[in-house]
């Protein structure tokens, strides 16, 4: 029986202590809000002309996304509010040494700080967490929030661009005569310094895969041209200068675009007879149009600037269109014939002699008649003389029925038939009359072959002119494509964020560069 009695006594003591602690906190709350008559609608000042100092700081936990089409920056942040409320002061010794009191945010006065440049119509902080109140009247409120802020996008150097996205906080309820916005201060070695940067905890920060943070400055802006009675007189702005990581766009957009655009040079290597020169050029043009359509869906519909990729695609499309026109002209030249066009001597000299030498084009040389051709020509004269002798000795009946008599078994003539003696003029006339049809036929064949060779040679000259134009265009288009591509994309490579957040201000607004007060 002795064992359970001490146990029950210990439990009773714990319950009494717990109830006493709860009673002290409850008594403190009653003292602050009921006995003192706390009113959360009134500013925590003794006189009307007094100003409440509100200090702000921002902790970035995640840069979620930047939607270029909507021009919206989505961030996950913690915004720290701090101010002095003299009505919430107490003596800790009178209330069980309670130095910190956690209260719902709807029980105390709030400065109503909102994100002025929000992009979703939600000005207020959605999650109202508790406030921390110390016995000295110092109030701290650290609510988390997911902000969707407006961020004007500059597409000039896409995808080698950087953006300056800011989060502008101000009070839409109180003017500069009622509250004074400032940056929160920290102490180090008995010296205080303002937090002039966005706080990032390396352990709690999630890095974005598309953007990297270059500068994260914080600054209080006061516009003296705006009267203090206006809510636009002052604000606290947190600047996020971010740079795009272009690797994704280089692999998926730039490299395919460049490769497809340079394929247009292969058109000048295709022979005119294949009939695919224009088809290849038009296919490249269609592919560039598809890429341009994809990029237009990625960027905001703005007429302020043209992105680098858009400039390159437009440059390539203009060049490809010119190549299509050149292909049509080259095909027209290639299929020209002597029956439709005449190749002038000036064009022949320029495109068949001068330009090929400059473009290092080689053409098979024409073969000169050699000694074998002369031997063949002299030997043919012997055949002709033998034929004349044969025709002069044979009678017409034998010439006409020689084979037929052999088929019927008739003996050949042992002696040659000779015509009665005639004058030499008659013999020559008869021989001429007999040989004239054959000679005329041979002359016709020779003239026809000569005309055909001349026709083919002229047609080959037109083909060579077309090849020369192709080679000339290849030597012109390729350097233009290379220089144009390098000039366009080097603009983006050298487009870097400024070394300091604000032009003309040498201060870096970084944790390592603190300005002590």
Swiss-Prot record:
GO (cellular component) term, any one: postsynaptic specialization membrane
Membrane protein topology class: Multi-pass membrane protein
Cysteine pairings via disulfide bonds: 151-165
UniProt topological domain (Cytoplasmic) ranges: 334-471
Glycosyltransferase among keywords: no
Transmembrane segment boundaries: 246-270, 278-296, 312-333, 472-490
Reactions performed catalytically: K(+)(in) = K(+)(out); Na(+)(in) = Na(+)(out)
GO BP terms in the entry: acetylcholine receptor signaling pathway; chemical synaptic transmission; membrane depolarization; monoatomic cation transport; monoatomic ion transmembrane transport; musculoskeletal movement; regulation of membrane potential; skeletal muscle contraction
MF GO annotations: acetylcholine binding; acetylcholine receptor activity; acetylcholine-gated monoatomic cation-selective channel activity; ligand-gated monoatomic ion channel activity; transmitter-gated monoatomic ion channel activity involved in regulation of postsynaptic membrane potential
Function: After binding acetylcholine, the AChR responds by an extensive change in conformation that affects all subunits and leads to opening of an ion-conducting channel across the plasma membrane.
NCBIfam families: LIC
Name assigned to this protein: Acetylcholine receptor subunit delta
Organism: Rattus norvegicus
């Amino acid at each position: 029986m002795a064992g359970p009695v001490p146990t029950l006594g210990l439990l009773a003591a714990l319950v009494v202590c717990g109830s006493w602690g709860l009673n002290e906190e409850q008594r403190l709350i009653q003292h602050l809000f009921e006995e003192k008559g706390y009113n959360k609608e009134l500013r925590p000042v003794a006189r009307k002309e007094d100003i409440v100092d509100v200090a702000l700081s921002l902790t970035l936990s995640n840069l979620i996304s930047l939607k270029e089409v909507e021009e919206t920056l989505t961030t996950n942040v913690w915004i720290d509010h701090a101010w002095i409320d003299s009505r919430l002061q107490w003596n800790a010794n009178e209330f069980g040494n309670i130095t910190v009191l956690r209260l719902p945010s709807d029980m105390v006065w709030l400065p109503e700080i909102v994100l002025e440049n929000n992009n979703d119509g939600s000005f207020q902080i959605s999650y109202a967490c508790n406030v921390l109140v110390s016995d000295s009247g110092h109030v701290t409120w650290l609510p988390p929030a997911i902000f969707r802020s407006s961020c004007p996008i500059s597409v000039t150097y896409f995808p080698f661009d950087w953006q300056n996205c800011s989060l502008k906080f101000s009070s839409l309820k109180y003017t500069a005569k009622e509250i004074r916005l400032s940056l929160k201060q920290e102490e180090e070695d008995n010296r205080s310094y303002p937090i002039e940067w966005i706080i990032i905890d390396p352990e709690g920060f999630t890095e974005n895969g598309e953007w990297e943070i270059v500068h994260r400055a914080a600054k209080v802006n006061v516009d003296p041209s705006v009267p203090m009675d206006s809510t636009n007189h002052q604000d606290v702005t947190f600047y996020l200068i971010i740079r795009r990581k272009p690797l994704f766009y280089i692999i998926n957009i730039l490299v395919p675009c460049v490769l497809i655009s340079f394929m247009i040079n292969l058109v000048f290597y295709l022979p005119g007879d294949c009939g695919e020169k224009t088809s290849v050029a038009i296919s490249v043009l269609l592919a560039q149009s598809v890429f341009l359509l994809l990029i237009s869906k990625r960027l905001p519909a703005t007429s302020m600037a043209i992105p680098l990729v858009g400039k390159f695609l437009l440059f390539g499309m203009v060049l490809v269109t010119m190549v299509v026109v050149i292909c049509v002209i080259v095909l027209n030249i290639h299929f020209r014939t002597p029956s439709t066009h005449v190749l002038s001597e000036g064009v022949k000299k320029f495109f068949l002699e001068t330009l090929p030498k400059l473009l290092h084009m080689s053409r098979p040389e024409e073969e000169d008649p050699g000694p074998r051709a002369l031997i063949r020509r002299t030997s043919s004269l012997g055949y002709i003389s033998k034929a004349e002798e044969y025709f002069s000795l044979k009678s017409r009946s034998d010439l006409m029925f020689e084979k037929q008599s052999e088929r019927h078994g008739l003996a050949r003539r042992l002696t040659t038939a000779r015509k009665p003696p005639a004058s030499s003029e008659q013999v020559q006339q008869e021989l001429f009359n007999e040989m004239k049809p054959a000679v005329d036929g041979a002359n016709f064949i020779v003239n026809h072959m000569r005309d055909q060779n001349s026709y083919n040679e002229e047609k080959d000259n037109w083909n060579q002119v077309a090849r020369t134009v192709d080679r000339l265009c290849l030597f012109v288009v390729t350097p233009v494509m290379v220089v144009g591509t390098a000039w366009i994309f080097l603009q983006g490579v050298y487009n870097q964020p400024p070394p300091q957040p604000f032009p003309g201000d040498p201060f870096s607004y970084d944790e390592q560069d603190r300005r002590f007060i």
